[in-house]
Curated annotation (Swiss-Prot):
The lineage of its organism: Eukaryota, Metazoa, Chordata, Craniata, Vertebrata. Residues 69-160, 210-297, 329-403, 454-518 form a coiled coil. This is Coiled-coil domain-containing protein 154. The keyword Magnesium does not apply. Keywords: Coiled coil, Endosome. The keyword Coiled coil applies. It is found in: Early endosome. Disulfide bonds: none annotated. One of its GO terms (cellular component) is early endosome.
Length: 664
């Protein structure tokens, strides 16, 4: 499966995606809190710069994904080259085996020719003895001596040829063993290189996990700083409000005679400004939410297209793997049938040779007996020479027997070699069938585990959007409650200010009456009213301070609750990634990013800048898939080094087809 490609340089784990979504949540929270800060203009620029962060992250993610795709394509090309090399090596071995068989056949034909020559040499002197008459006996003996010398030379020549043939066979066997050792060495070197690449990948993944942890720590520090800044701002605002109230009370005492119309105008202008600012902030937040939704929809479309492309690749690779398996089975059956036919032919030829040699020996013995009887009757005068001739004939018979024994030994050796080769072939076939059965069982079991695991992960991922929505709803509710409380407190304070104004107006009236009448009783009443007014002012100050402390406590408690909820959500996200995230390069173990993941295959990812889960393939799944491919290919290469090329085209349907269900 050439997947949303990546290589060791990229290692974009799903933790990056999760951090992006957390940053978006934090930006939304901070914007919701900062929207209350209407008096500070610098915060608008800060929010604008904060909104640019996800866009930069998305651009980086796409670049890294493109790099990953390029690296995966390069790896696919390298694996195809490896397949071609393995095919060339197997073809070379088959050619060499054919050459060896041709040599063996040539040697067998030469042995037959030599046997015919020996038989002719054995028959020719006996015929000449029958044809020759008595007076030509001396010439006959000379020719017999010459023939015996020629037979001996022919026997020595035959023995030399047999020794050369044995040496050639040994040399060819040594060459075959050397080439097999070279091939095994090459395969082991390639396995070591792959293991080194896996270790490098694992190190890079651990580095990325550390970077993610550092990023999360930074985010937590930023959240704490934001909480502290918000608490300080609220405290400053409350202090400003308190000072403003005190100044207003002093101004009320000093400006008793100023008109109330100016105050009403000022209050109305302030309210209008506040409402206009609130509307602007509301419009800005709505525009940002729309932009974020549009981005989320676009990214969901891209991810769906990628998933469809990957599904098509999986189907194509499964078909390709099945075709390869069918072709391999056909080739193996054809080879097995050819070998069985050759073995049967060789057995029949060996039986015919044995029968032919036995018949020839019997004929030679009968001819020798007849020749001895005729020579005894016809050549009584030449007993000494006949005795010498009989000794030479006996030696020749012994040499012929030795030659027949040697031929039998050679036939036995050939039979043994054929039997050993047949046993080796049967053992290898049985081992290969066992490997195929085990691999199929492992694949079936793995698919079952993957389906169960995918269901669990899908349930967990589906629960995440609900948690995020609940937190956002809590934030909105909290914001509305705070707004209601602030408005209620403002109304209560306005009511208290109006009561103070009424009391001050009553005091002014009483002062005017004093100026007009100056009675002692009214002075005492005014003094009592002033005392009550002072008490009310003290009570009002105490109530303001108590309200301030209560609000501070409530705000601190709410901020703590928010931080705890965010921390729990973050922990749940990290736990999910750690339990279900990407895996290590060694498929024997079931972890890849040791800090993040455990037994992870294909899950639903969360799209960037989105709150809804999307069915998409991530970089970590591609890495996992590549791991499975390499693991299975290494198993095939170890147990069957001559047929690795056929299994290299293995990717999920189960990698890609995993990498088939072995290759991209």
């Amino acid at each position: 499966m050439s997947e949303p490609a990546d290589g060791p340089s990229l290692r974009l784990s799903p933790s990056h995606l999760s951090t992006v979504t957390l940053e978006d949540l934090e930006l939304l929270l901070t914007e919701g809190l900062v929207s209350a800060e209407t008096s500070e203009r610098d915060e608008c620029s800060g929010r604008a710069s904060g909104s640019l962060v996800p866009e930069q992250d998305t651009s980086k993610l796409w670049k890294q994904l493109e790099q990953w795709v390029a690296e995966l394509q390069a790896e696919v090309v390298r694996l195809r080259g490896h397949k071609e090399r393995c095919e060339h090596a197997t073809l070379g071995l088959l050619r060499e085996l054919l050459q060896v068989r041709a040599r063996v056949q040539m040697q067998a034909s030469e042995l037959r020719q030599l046997r015919q020559v020996v038989q002719q040499a054995a028959w020719s002197p006996e015929k000449e003895e029958l044809e020759l008459s008595g007076p030509q006996s001396q010439n006959q003996m000379q020719t017999l001596d010459k023939r015996l010398v020629e037979v001996r030379e022919a026997l020595t020549h035959i023995r030399r040829k047999q020794a050369l043939q044995d040496s050639e066979r040994k040399h060819s066997e040594q060459e075959i063993n050397l080439r097999l050792t070279n091939l095994t060495g090459m395969l082991s070197q390639e396995e070591q290189g792959r293991e080194a690449a896996c270790s490098a990948l694992q190190k890079n993944q651990e580095d990325t996990s550390q970077k993610v942890d550092l990023g999360l720590a930074k985010m937590q520090a930023q959240m704490t700083k934001l909480n502290e800044e918000m608490s300080l701002r609220f405290l400053k605002r409350e202090a400003k409000l308190c000072s403003f109230l005190q100044k207003s009370f002093l101004a009320l005492e000093q400006r008793m005679k100023s008109s109330e119309s100016t105050r009403q105008i000022a209050e109305s202008s302030l309210r209008e400004e506040l409402e206009s600012r609130w509307q602007k902030l509301h419009e800005l937040t709505e525009e940002r939410l729309r932009a974020l939704r549009a981005q989320r929809e676009e990214e969901e479309g891209h991810l769906l297209e990628q998933c469809r492309g990957l599904d098509k690749a999986v189907v194509y690779l499964t078909k390709f793997v099945r075709q390869n398996q069918v072709s391999l089975n056909r080739v193996l059956m054809a080879e097995q049938k050819a070998r069985e036919a050759k073995v049967s032919l060789e057995e029949t030829q060996a039986g015919e040779l044995a029968s032919y040699v036995h018949e020839n020996l019997e004929a030679v013995q009968m001819a020798g007996k007849l020749a001895q009887q005729e020579t005894q009757d016809a050549l009584e005068l030449l007993q000494e020479k006949s005795q010498v001739l009989e000794g030479s004939v006996a030696g020749l018979d012994q040499q012929l027997k030795d030659l027949s024994d040697h031929c039998l030994a050679l036939s036995w050796r050939l039979d043994l070699q054929e039997q050993t080769l047949g046993l080796k072939l049967s053992q290898k076939q049985a081992a290969w069938e066992g490997m195929e059965r085990e691999s199929l069982k492992d694949l079936v079991q793995w698919l079952k585990e993957v389906t169960a695991h995918l269901e669990e992960v899908q349930e967990k991922v589906n629960s995440l959007p609900q948690q995020i929505e609940s937190i956002s709803n809590k934030c909105v509710i909290h914001k509305s409650e705070v707004d209601v409380k602030i408005s209620a407190e403002g109304k209560a304070r306005e009511f208290e200010v109006e009561t103070v104004r009424q009391e001050l107006a009553a005091l002014l009236m009483s002062v005017q009456l004093l100026k007009e009448e100056n009675p002692g009783r009214k002075i005492a009443e005014i003094q009592g009213q002033l005392a009550t007014f002072q008490k009310q002012m003290i009570k009002l100050e105490n109530s303001l301070q108590a309200n301030k402390t209560i609000q501070n406590l409530k705000f601190n408690n709410e901020t703590k609750l928010r931080t705890e909820e965010i921390a729990t959500l973050r922990e749940s996200m990290l736990r999910l990634w750690s339990e279900e995230g990407p895996w290590p390069l060694t498929l024997g173990s079931k972890r890849v990013f040791m800090s993040l993941v455990r037994q992870r295959f294909f899950i639903k990812d969360v799209a960037l800048d989105a709150m809804v889960s999307v069915n998409s393939w991530g970089v970590y799944q591609a890495v996992r898939w590549l791991r499975w491919k390499r693991f299975l290919l290494n198993l095939v290469a170890q147990k069957r080094p001559g047929v690795t090329s056929a299994m290299t085209q293995w990717k999920p349907a189960y990698e890609v087809t995993s990498l088939t269900v072995f290759q991209k």
